Swiss-Prot record:
Protein name: 2-(3-amino-3-carboxypropyl)histidine synthase subunit 1
Record carries keyword Metal-binding: yes
Role noted for this protein: Catalyzes the first step of diphthamide biosynthesis, a post-translational modification of histidine which occurs in elongation factor 2. DPH1 and DPH2 transfer a 3-amino-3-carboxypropyl (ACP) group from S-adenosyl-L-methionine (SAM) to a histidine residue, the reaction is assisted by a reduction system comprising DPH3 and a NADH-dependent reductase, predominantly CBR1.
PANTHER family: 2-(3-AMINO-3-CARBOXYPROPYL)HISTIDINE SYNTHASE SUBUNIT 1, DIPHTHAMIDE BIOSYNTHESIS PROTEIN
Gene encoding the protein: DPH1
An example Gene Ontology biological process: protein histidyl modification to diphthamide
Length: 347
């Protein structure tokens, strides 16, 4: 086994962006501590381009065999600890949605913290906002969000910053399926370049104004979401589904998306209907067309699949929350440990 020398680290990692923290030293130390001989790596698409650099470093400095998992990774829910026998799985780019103690192998989460220009972000906020605001983002920007809060809070009488939280997520962290109810702020600013996770917070908080600060383009934009159309569409699908005679209940098998506890709750709720249990890795209109004898479906994988793409399916495709929904607020608490609900991963 080759021993890593400090002076060699910059040369080995020169192809990785300097503001992305892949915590390579931590990964190497963990492999050595465990004596791991086979290591599997899992990356979301946005980080996949850097995977082979990291694999080369691991193999060179530990002698471990590296295997790159090829299945698509939408989020921390897609962590795949069961597909291949290995001594360690390193999952990049997401927070710990599934506790490591529940895994079938040793797992190391690497958030891939992204450093941004805090001063520019703070100046953009000072120029455009007053009073109390909320700041949110994904785990990759979480440390930057906390630094941004400290910078803004240092100026008394200016903008007051709060980091909303829904446990077990970190303060300020949101997911496309899990976001807190935010109160007492005039606006919410999301730090990041995409909309998917921001939309989770927007769906949960239709009463608030949302903005996005992109640290790469250094632009601030106001974001909107058509809550009324979304809610109308989903209520219509719920009515159609419960007017039928049968349900196909799909347990997602992509990583850890499926939850058997939710499955049991959904099946019990639908006991007056004919229920067919189905297991699928990825759900698509074409795959469900094969089940022409089933009137409607419930998918236990990703709630946003139904919310965002439900219209592409010929038959209603409900989320677990919608099976129990009786009106009122549309919750986004799929991975929340707060409150109760038979549609949630944690109760």
């Amino acid at each position: 086994m080759v021993v890593l020398k400090q002076e060699e680290v910059p040369e080995c990692l020169r192809y990785l962006p300097r503001n992305y923290n892949f915590e390579t030293g931590k990964v190497l130390r963990t492999i050595r501590r465990l004596g791991a001989k086979r290591v599997t790596l899992q990356f979301p698409d946005g980080l996949l381009r850097y995977s082979f650099v990291i694999m080369d470093v691991i193999e060179k400095y530990t002698g471990a065999e590296c295997i790159l998992l090829n299945d698509v990774v939408y989020g921390g829910c897609c962590i795949d600890d069961e597909s291949i026998a290995s001594d360690l799985l390193v999952h990049y780019g997401h927070s710990c949605l599934v506790p490591v103690g529940e895994m079938s192998t040793k797992v190391l989460y690497i958030f891939v913290d992204i450093r941004i220009d805090i001063d520019h972000a703070a100046e953009m906020i000072r120029r455009n906002f007053q009073g109390k605001i909320g700041v949110i983002g994904t785990i990759q920007f979480n440390s930057s969000i906390n630094r941004l809060k400290r910078v803004l809070d240092e100026e008394r009488g200016g903008v007051e910053c709060t980091l909303p939280q829904i446990r077990p997520l970190s303060s300020g962290e949101v997911l496309g399926c899990t976001a807190p109810k935010i109160e007492g702020v005039s606006a919410v600013i999301s730090i990041g370049d995409g909309r998917f996770h921001l939309e989770g917070a927007m769906i949960r908080n239709p009463h608030l104004r949302f903005y996005k600060y992109c640290p790469f383009s250094r632009r601030m934009t106001q974001e909107s979401y058509d809550h009324s159309t979304m809610l109308s569409d989903r209520k219509s699908e719920i009515r159609k589904a419960f007017s039928g005679r049968s349900f196909g209940v799909i347990l997602g098998s992509l990583g850890r998306q499926g939850n058997r506890s939710i499955l049991r709750s959904v099946v019990d709720r639908l006991k007056e209907y004919d229920v067919y249990l189905i297991m699928l890795d990825e759900i698509s209109p074409k795959k469900l067309e094969r089940y022409n004898f089933i009137d409607s479906f419930v998918q236990i994988s990703c709630p946003r699949l139904s919310i965002d793409w439900g219209k592409l399916f010929k038959k209603p495709l409900l989320t677990p929350f919608e099976v129990f929904y009786s009106g009122g607020e549309y919750l986004m608490d799929y991975y929340s440990r707060e409150g109760s609900g038979e549609w949630k991963n944690y109760r």
